[in-house]
A protein has these predicted regions:
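Gly/Thr-rich phosphate-binding beta-strand-loop-beta motif of the actin/hexokinase/Hsp70
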Residues: 2-22, 106, 212
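Short, glycine/acidic-enriched loop or turn micro-motifs at the edges of active sites
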Residues: 14, 60, 84, 215
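Nucleic-acid-processing active sites and adjacent nucleic-acid-binding tracks
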Residues: 22-53
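Short glycine-rich phosphate-binding loop at a beta-alpha junction
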Residues: 51-62
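Long, charge-rich intrinsically disordered scaffolds of nucleic-acid metabolism proteins
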Residues: 71, 78-203, 211
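Phosphate-backbone recognition surface of nucleic-acid-processing proteins
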Residues: 207, 212-285, 289, 316-321
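Basic, amphipathic alpha-helical segments enriched in Lys/Arg and hydrophobic/aromatic residues
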Residues: 284-321
Length: 321
């Protein structure tokens, strides 16, 4: 990045977005409505500026349509974890918090990110209509699973008079789960049949794991093994200072992907010979079961990443322990 590179920070709220542009002859701060027509207007305003990077926080979905609109206009967009952005603000002494200040801070954060060699790991590929639909189905299934768990917990403590109501709700949620899962599987088969077949060639990856990876980890196959492990949050991070060597820890990353990968690895540790052998070898070396399982998660993820990058299915001769 040159000193004159243009970077943009966008603070996203439900009704509006605040935009801060740095690197122009004079900085720009402006507010737009958070709706499709305003998204197009913002993209049109930014496109002539030769923007190096646009940064916004993940806000539970309020940022999704804007990010897609800007990416579709050819602008590089990074949607970052809010904790990363807030930690950056604190490190810069920015303790005050308003929408306008946050937008400026995100623009400054963008100015740092564009200098990084691993910038590609921050920029999520553009989600097309099929991927957005699949992501919505994956999210809905996750919501239904959470609702089912809550109702089952209520049932354990319920007195007789309310049990029929809870049981009826459990039955209704179960039917909705079946419907959404069938819809999800059908969508994957219609639009991602080859990629799904590739992913599911690895023992441990079932239909839910495959759909989640396709929907929520579009970087799979585009990054190197270290970048993909760090992105998901299964890469051990150093914690050293001077002569002190701290314990390596995994932290950050995409929680939902990590949760799905955890469940897939539990299955793989029993039914995938390569992962099972790797897990057993780590236990024999004295590793704690949880440490060994995280290492297996990392191995499974990086193997899937290589499979997608090379477009080759699981091969025990290549992906052995």
């Amino acid at each position: 990045m040159s000193v004159t590179s243009v970077v943009v920070g966008i603070d996203v709220a439900k009704a509006h977005v605040d935009v801060s542009v740095l690197g122009c002859p004079s900085s720009i701060a402006q507010r737009f409505d958070n709706e499709a027509e305003a998204h197009s207007a913002l993209a049109a305003a930014l496109k002539p500026l030769d923007v190096a990077l646009v940064v916004m926080e993940a806000t539970g979905g309020y940022e999704a349509a804007l990010a897609c609109a800007l990416q579709a206009a050819g602008l590089p967009v990074a949607v970052v974890n809010p904790r990363q952005a807030r930690d950056f603000a604190k490190s810069m002494g920015r303790l005050a918090k308003t929408d306008r200040i946050d937008a400026r801070m995100l623009a400054e954060f963008a100015g740092v990110l564009v200098r990084r060699d691993d910038l590609a790991s921050f920029i999520r590929p553009l989600a097309d209509a099929q991927q957005q639909a699949l992501a919505a189905m994956v999210t809905r299934r996750r919501q239904l699973v959470t609702m089912m768990l809550s109702e089952r917990q209520r049932l354990q403590l319920a007195i007789a008079i309310v049990r029929p109501s809870i049981e009826a709700m459990i039955e209704a949620i179960g039917q909705q789960l079946d419907d959404v899962e069938a819809q999800m599987v059908g969508h994957v088969q219609a639009h991602y049949a080859e990629l799904n077949k590739l992913l599911r060639s690895a023992a441990g990856i079932g239909p839910v794991a495959s759909a989640t990876l396709i929907a929520e980890l579009p970087e799979l196959g585009r990054l190197n093994r270290r970048e993909i492990a760090a992105l998901v949050g299964v890469a051990p991070m150093a914690n050293d200072s001077g002569n002190s060597k701290g314990r390596r820890r995994v932290q950050g990353g995409r929680f939902e992907i990590r949760r799905v990968l955890y469940m897939a690895t539990l299955t793989a540790a029993r039914h995938n010979p390569a992962i099972k052998a790797f897990y057993d070898r780590l236990l024999a070396a004295g590793k704690l079961p949880k440490v060994a399982l995280v290492a297996c998660m990392r191995k499974l993820l990086t193997t899937l990443n290589a499979m997608v990058r090379t477009n080759k299915p699981w091969d025990k001769s290549l992906h052995g322990a």
